[in-house]
Structures are given as C-alpha cells and as structure tokens.
C-alpha cells in the first residue's frame, strides 16, 4: 500500500472517500503512527479524530506537510482536498518550490478544486488556461476517449454504474476554474463543452522532460467529491465541527467518487505517457 498524505479542506470531504475504498481505520493515523494514510488539517477542514480513533488527537497543520521537501518525501502520494479558495498566503514560496521538487523526484500529487494554485504559483510550466467564472451547476460532461486510459475510464464507468452511456458522466455541482489544458504537458480526461471547461487533467513530471525521465505525476480536478455524495442522511462534510469520521454520513460511491477512485489507482501506477496503452505488471 502506498504511503499517502491527505490535507482536508472546508469545501469538500476527500477524507470520507478513504473509508469508502475499504481502507481500515487502523491505517489512518498521524505521521508518527504506523498507518499508511496520514491526515493534515487544511483551511476550515476537519482537524481532529473522533474519540474512538487515535484517541481524538488533532491533525497536524497542512503547512507541516507542504512546508518543505523533507516533510513531503516520505509520501508516495499527496491528496489535497478543496479549501474553498486558493489561499496562497497560507502556502508561500517555499511550499510551492517544495511541491514542485517533490513531484519532479517522483512524487504524485492529486490537486482537487482550487489547488491549481500549486501549478499556477510554483515553478511548473503552464499546464492549463484558468478562469474565475461562476460554477457550472449540474452538467453532463464528456469522458475523453481519444487516448487509451480515457477509453478505459469510459468503459469502466459503465461497468461499475458510474455512467449510463459510454463517454458521458453526470456531474453534480461542476466547478469552473479550468478552461483547457496545455497539450504540450497535460491530457484532459473529462470536459464540458457549454461552457468550455476541463474537470480532470493529468501531467507527468518533471514536465517537459523525456518520457523515460518522468517518474512523477499530477492530477488536477475541478470536481467536488462531496458534491456528488448526498443521501437522505445529508452530505459528507469536512469542518472543525466534525471530528473524523463524524462528517462522513454517506455510503456507497457516487459517480464522481468512482471517477476519483479510478484516478487514484492511475496516479499511483507506474508512470507512462498518457498516449500509451498500459502494460500488465511484470510478475516475478
């Protein structure tokens, strides 16, 4: 199992997906514990465990994770949950440089809505054109099938009940901060046409390096996980008011969560150009 750092945020509840993917509670700890999933408190997000989990201790601040390359290095994958805005003042130049160095060394970063700030403010090349327009509301988006893994995502979503028709995804509360990807570096996976927007894109790192020199990866999402996970019992929430996992009230995977599950497996896999067909792992 990869070692994963997850930062919470007050505008989504990415941490609730961990439970739905079947990760045992014993695997969720603070960094000094033995768990493979370590939580960090982002802006207005959940910041402590419930009394029956890790003795109710507080999460370290997200700045303790992204503040330096040394604190990022222990992790194979960093998951950044939406904070509701970019909040660059809570990150800073040292953090932007550290995250870029982390991905260049082979680290994987999943950047949820508003975490495009890492790619806009850090020493990355321009991988997308951004916008500050209003959210899109509910949308039927296109799953891009012009590359092998996009086609696989489309087929998989139909198989697991995430899509009714191949090549389409119904999105609840679609966001609109990405207009289009820069094809020199990035591949779009899910997009809207009216208005034009990208809901998922990926890029291998170091960006611009030859493929055989790229071992890291970033995924940028404009989807909220909790926005698609609503039941009669409410919506999953992340807030200092909810000790984890009390803010996680839904069960089962929404279509948006199923997409994220696919993307998490992809971002954790061996890095290959998105234009190539993934090969089965070598069994020794």
Residue ranges and their predicted role:
Residues 49-73, 79-81, 86-94, 162-208:
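A Trp-anchored, charged/polar loop motif used as the substrate-binding/catalytic surface
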Residues 11, 112, 118-143, 196-199, ...:
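Extracellular ligand-binding/catalytic regions of CAZymes and related secreted enzymes
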Residues 11-125:
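Helical hinge/lid and interdomain linker segments adjacent to catalytic or ligand-binding clefts
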Residues 1-9:
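Short hydrophobic beta-strand segments
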Residues 25-31, 168-169, 272-280:
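Surface-exposed patches in mature extracellular/periplasmic domains of secreted proteins
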Residues 12, 93-100, 104, 151, ...:
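A structural signal for well-ordered alpha-helical segments within the folded catalytic domains
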Residues 1, 70-74, 102-105, 195, ...:
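Extracellular/periplasmic catalytic domains that process cell-envelope and extracellular macromolecules
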Residues 84-183, 193:
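A glycine-rich, often tryptophan-bearing local segment used as a flexible ligand/cofactor-contacting loop or short
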